[in-house]
Regions:
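Bacterial N-terminal signal peptides
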Residues: 6-17
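Periplasmic alpha-helical coiled-coil/stalk elements that build and connect Gram-negative outer-membrane
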Residues: 120, 126-246, 251-254, 259-265, ...
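Acidic, low-complexity, intrinsically disordered peripheral segments
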Residues: 28-29, 439-517
Length: 517
């Protein structure tokens, strides 16, 4: 998916602003805030700005190189005639042929840019996952804590009732002692639940890059916004363009280009040059026009370098000086002048064989990494899928068990009202529902977290996919119905919160225009 940055800014302003004003943050909001504030992601965004600069530099190698050169000689000796010479010329050089090396360098730069793009995507996924896991963990702890709180309120009411029964002698001492043991265990669990909730919100603050003193409030009703699907209903399709897989393929392409560069370094570089200007033996303005052409050849043959230069020029009048590379200035008279120079450096690149060996090893290493990465990727996907099926089955198992416990508890409640069972039996029945709810929440949130991990590997929308979907409006889910029955409240009396009319686009819209998924 590829979107422009203004879509992101527009989405933030329109969709994110009202929720901040209300102080209620949804899952999407937490992800947006965390990704926007993450320092590592911002740093990688700045680093990516170097690639357009380097690309422009590579393009400049196709352009002619212009330069203005000045050369002067002055000699004033008591026993000789004073000499004065000045030379000003405009020089131009154009690369005609380099064996395709410049084009390969451009391709290498483009591949490095794409590799960096995939690394940024992997970083986004890591940040997205860490924020989402922290958010889901807090939602779970919040639900567990609310269940403990409701249980505590009920117990206080029951405690007042039992106190009167004790005063009237209607309750035995053994029942009172059992309730004290139960109360200690319950309070211990509740203390642990409150601590876990505080740690979960701190973890969420950390993943969102927020100061713990910043006041935020998360919207409730999470179980009424998300709809779970059977993971075995659709056949899984592995994402060919996952950033991890694309990165390893691009690294192979880069290693192949590096090897190709070394294999083609024997091809000569051909440079055509020319100059035009004036020189003279007096002061300015200069009198004599000069111009000429030059041809340069460079090559590397098995670690032995070869250079050759040829220049033909014309001196209109007077005497001039030509500067020959490697030989210094030489005087020339009016008319045509030329020079040829050449040099051979025998085995002056002794490390060439090692460079070739290193490039071959880099290519073999890149292919080995790709193969291992593919095996690990498929293994990870299938292992997560197996775990996902297990969690979904556990969730349904605990769901049915909790429904059964809840129905039995309703019967026990009626029997307790009629005095047919003791308070201990009633408390045990309530304890079964209470423990069942805790057991139910564990696979429920684990399923969503595991499905999120798999969705990121498959390249699907993390808010709307084959495993779950965030709905724009609340709906009565199985879990929310059980929680409503547990609270003993009618479904219509559940407090509503403002929901978004439209689901928010997921944060991979923050990708740069050149990045595709």
């Amino acid at each position: 998916m590829c979107y422009k940055l203004w879509v992101f800014c527009f989405g933030i302003g329109i969709l994110f602003g009202p929720l901040l004003a209300e102080g209620k943050l949804l899952w999407e909001d937490c992800v947006w805030i965390g990704m926007e504030r993450n320092g590592s992601l911002g740093l990688e965004q700045v680093r990516s700005e170097i690639f357009p600069i380097l690309s422009r530099e590579k393009w400049k190698q196709y352009l002619p190189k212009l330069g203005v050169h000045y050369f002067g000689i002055f000699s004033k000796n008591p026993e000789q005639i004073d000499q004065e010479y000045r030379d000003v010329r405009l020089q131009i050089q154009q690369l005609l042929y380099d064996g395709g090396e410049t084009e390969r360098e451009k391709q290498k730069l483009e591949i490095r840019k794409l590799i960096h793009s995939e690394e940024k995507k992997l970083l986004r996924e890591k940040i997205f996952k860490s924020i989402s896991i922290a958010y889901l963990s807090f939602q779970k702890r919040q639900l567990v804590d609310s269940i403990y709180q409701l249980r505590s309120e009920r117990y206080k009411l029951e405690q007042q009732k039992r106190k009167k029964e004790m005063e009237l002698g209607l309750s035995s001492k053994s029942e009172s002692e059992w309730r004290k043991v139960w109360e200690v265990e319950f309070q211990s669990k509740w203390i642990h639940s409150e601590s876990a909730k505080k740690l979960a919100i701190l973890d969420l603050y950390q993943t969102m890059s927020l100061d713990p003193n910043v006041p935020i409030s998360l919207a409730g009703g999470f179980t009424e916004r998300i709809r779970l699907f059977d993971p075995s209903s659709d056949q899984m399709i592995v994402n060919e363009n996952h950033p991890l897989r694309r990165k390893t393929r691009l690294q192979i392409e880069l290693a192949e280009l590096e090897e190709e560069s070394l294999e083609n370094d024997w091809k000569p570089k051909l440079v055509l040059g020319g100059y035009v200007g004036k020189n003279g033996n007096g002061g300015f303005p200069l009198q004599n026009e000069i111009y000429g052409l030059s041809v340069g050849v460079q090559a590397n043959l098995g670690g032995t370098s070869f250079q050759s230069n040829t220049q033909n020029g014309i001196q209109s009048e007077g005497n001039g000086i030509q500067r020959i590379p490697g030989y210094g200035p030489q005087p020339v008279g009016p008319g045509e002048n030329s020079f040829q120079s050449g040099s051979i450096g025998l085995f002056d690149d002794l490390g060439r064989n090692k460079k070739i060996f290193d490039s071959k090893m880099s290519l073999l290493q890149a292919k080995a990494d790709w193969k291992q990465s593919e095996i690990s990727f498929f293994s990870q996907v299938h292992s997560i899928e197996i775990k996902l099926h297990e969690l979904y089955q556990k969730y349904n198992l605990y769901l049915e068990s909790t429904k059964s416990n809840l129905n039995q508890h309703r019967s026990k409640r009626e029997e307790n009202k009629q005095g047919l069972i003791s308070e201990i039996e009633y408390l045990k029945s309530e304890e079964e529902v209470f423990v069942g709810l805790e057991l139910l929440l564990e696979p429920y949130f684990q399923y969503i977290s595991t499905a999120l991990e798999l969705v990121l590997l498959l390249g699907e929308n993390p808010f709307d996919n084959r495993y779950y979907r965030l709905e724009p409006n609340r709906f009565p889910s199985d879990l929310s119905k059980i929680l409503a029955d547990w609270k003993d409240l009618p479904q219509n009396d559940i407090r509503k919160i403002n929901e978004p009319i439209q689901k928010k686009p997921y944060p991979f819209l923050m990708e740069d225009p050149y990045e595709t998924r």
